[in-house]
Structure formats: C-alpha cells, structure tokens
C-alpha cells in the first residue's frame, strides 16, 4: 500500500514576510491521517485555520492567497505548498504568526530542507491521488493552461517575456515529476520581478521585504543579482514551481499531464477548479501495490539534495 505521509516531529524557522518586511515565525507540525494540509494564523485570537482548498484561493494578484469567509487572509503559500507536493506530504499543520508565509530565499529549497530536517513519516492509511480522466482547458486571451490524462505527472510550461536577458531558448521547461526531479530541478528556482514593478509596489506599501536576497531582479536590460542565475532557465523553472504549489491546493498529488502557456497563479487556480467541478474528468485513486503506481510517485520521501 502507498501510504500517506506526515512529519516525524515539529520544526520551526524564522524569516521575513515578502510584503510586510516583518519577521515571521513558521512552525510545521505533524498531523493525523486524512487531515490534509492546514494553514493556521496564530497571531489571531482565536487562531484562524485555512485548509488547503482550491476554492479558498480568492486573491492571486501578487501571490497565492487563501481567504476565509470572514475576509481573513494568509498569503504567499505557493512555495511551501510546492515543497509539500514535491515530498508527497499529505498531512501537516502549518502555523504562522503573521498574514504571510516567510519568503525565505524566494524558492522552495529552504522549505525542502526544513521538511527533511523534521523527517518524513509514513502513516498506515492509503495515500490518495487525483487522476485526470478527461482533458480540461482554460484560456484567458493568449494565455492558457490544460490538463490531459497521463500515467504520471508531466509538466510543460512556457513563459513569454520580451527581455534581453530572457532568450527564446530559456522560455520552456518540461519535466516528468518525481520527488528527486522536483528537488534537483525545480525547488531552487527563485521568484523574479522587474525593478520598476518592485519600486511601484514598495511605494504602495507592498513587497517591503523584497530584495536581491530573495528574488531575481531585472531592470530593462539585465539581471541585477551579482551571483546571476542558479539555472540559465531559472525563470520558467520558478513558474513551474508556482504551478506545482498552486495545483497542490487540491490536497492531493495529481496523475495527469499539465501544460501551460504564460499561466500564473490565477489561471492555475481556475484550471484546478474547472477540473474539480467536472466530476467526470477526474477520480480519486489509491494504490495497494507499488507496481501499479506511476514511477514518479514510488518513493517521494527518498530524495538526495
């Protein structure tokens, strides 16, 4: 039986909020089987919980933001959510003493280290997957994203920025998902932004924690980070990271083919909602025998950084 996974122990880290610029403490705790992914704001009295759910994503302007019925929000969840998807963590309580998850270095890599440091424990309950049965496509102008059936989880992402530092040879990335592939190829890819946009956001009291330490920053001609890029195609890899985090808002690893052109948090979420709303387009499955499971999901807890 392919089993559900949680953490062996709780673990804590402190970072900076991307938009507030304030110190944020993040605590990750083990959870019982079938709990799912639960975000919790402990700075509220009483604490407010946000189960990871496609319908709870109600703001995708600058990041993926969960908002409850009372208008309380928790922002910038996508990088941590991607790390959970990458390592196949089904059940976890995520506590944060602020309205946003700390940005860390702008990638999912610090969260991978944190989760592996806490340890991953299998639970004696079958892990469930969402298997795509029929094609689903969402379009917005020239942007689009789609799911198709596939025996595994394949991602194909294309960006299209007209910028001297983003050549046409680094605008597409394709990956067959596995924990190993995610950790080595995707998790270290950092978020990025353009200097003129960051300056405007900061003038509006946003992105106050944004810096060259937690983002790739571009002016009109070049990349401003002294150390350059971690991968020549780091920007499109980060967009794939975002998509993995956004799609894991359903709470299950996906078995299917995901392809996107110029997609972002909003379109990723619309695609996920469209899939879940069409009951004939997907099914919830579990596997008794490792021989039956797509290869990429066989041993998500065993990775080498």
UniProtKB/Swiss-Prot annotation:
The UniProt keyword set, sorted, is:
Hydrolase, Lipid A biosynthesis, Lipid biosynthesis, Lipid metabolism, Metal-binding, Zinc
Any idea which GO molecular function terms this record carries?
metal ion binding; UDP-3-O-acyl-N-acetylglucosamine deacetylase activity
A single Gene Ontology biological process assigned to it is: lipid A biosynthetic process
EC number(s) from the headed UniProt entry: 3.5.1.108
Quote the catalytic residue positions: 265
So, what pathway does this thing act in?
Glycolipid biosynthesis; lipid IV(A) biosynthesis; lipid IV(A) from (3R)-3-hydroxytetradecanoyl-[acyl-carrier-protein] and UDP-N-acetyl-alpha-D-glucosamine: step 2/6
Residues reported to bind Zn(2+): 79, 238, 242
Query: What reaction is this protein's catalytic activity?
Result: a UDP-3-O-[(3R)-3-hydroxyacyl]-N-acetyl-alpha-D-glucosamine + H2O = a UDP-3-O-[(3R)-3-hydroxyacyl]-alpha-D-glucosamine + acetate
Q: Name one Pfam family in it.
A: LpxC
GO cellular component annotations, sorted alphabetically? membrane
Q: Which Gene3D superfamilies match?
A: lpxc deacetylase, domain 1, lpxc deacetylase, domain 2
Judged by the first EC level, this protein's enzyme class is: hydrolase
Q: Which cofactor does it need?
A: Zn(2+)
> According to the lineage, what is the superkingdom?
Bacteria
The similarity comment for this entry is:
Belongs to the LpxC family.
Known function: Catalyzes the hydrolysis of UDP-3-O-myristoyl-N-acetylglucosamine to form UDP-3-O-myristoylglucosamine and acetate, the committed step in lipid A biosynthesis.
Q: Which HAMAP family match?
A: LpxC (MF_00388)
The name under which this protein is listed is: UDP-3-O-acyl-N-acetylglucosamine deacetylase
Gene this protein is translated from? lpxC
């Amino acid at each position: 039986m392919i089993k559900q996974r949680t953490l062996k122990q709780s673990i804590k880290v402190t970072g900076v909020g991307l938009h507030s610029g304030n110190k944020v403490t993040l605590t990750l705790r083990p959870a019982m089987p079938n709990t799912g992914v639960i975000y919790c704001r402990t700075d509220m009295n009483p604490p407010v919980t946000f189960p990871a759910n496609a319908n709870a994503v109600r703001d995708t302007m600058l990041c993926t933001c969960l908002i409850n019925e009372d208008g309380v929000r928790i922002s910038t969840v996508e990088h941590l959510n991607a790390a959970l998807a990458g390592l196949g963590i089904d059940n976890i309580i995520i506590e944060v003493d602020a309205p946003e998850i700390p940005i860390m270095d702008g990638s999912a890599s610090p969260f991978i280290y944190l989760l592996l440091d806490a340890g991953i424990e299998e639970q004696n309950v079958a892990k469930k997957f969402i298997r795509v049965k029929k094609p689903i496509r969402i379009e917005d102008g020239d942007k689009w994203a789609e799911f198709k059936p596939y025996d595994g989880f394949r991602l194909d992402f294309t960006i299209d920025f007209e910028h001297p530092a983003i050549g046409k040879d680094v605008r597409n990335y394709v990956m067959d998902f596995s924990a190993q592939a995610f950790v080595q190829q995707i998790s270290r890819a950092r978020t990025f932004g353009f200097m003129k946009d960051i300056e405007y956001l900061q003038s509006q009291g946003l992105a106050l924690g944004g810096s060259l330490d937690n983002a790739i920053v571009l002016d009109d001609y070049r990349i401003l980070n002294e150390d350059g890029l971690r991968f020549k195609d780091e920007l499109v890899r980060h967009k794939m990271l975002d998509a993995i985090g956004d799609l894991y808002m359903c709470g299950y690893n996906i078995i299917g083919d995901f392809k996107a052109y110029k997609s972002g948090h909003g379109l990723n979420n619309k695609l996920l909602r469209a899939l879940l709303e069409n009951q004939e387009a997907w099914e919830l499955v579990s596997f008794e025998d490792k021989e039956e499971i797509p290869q990429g999901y066989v041993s998500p807890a065993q990775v080498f950084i």
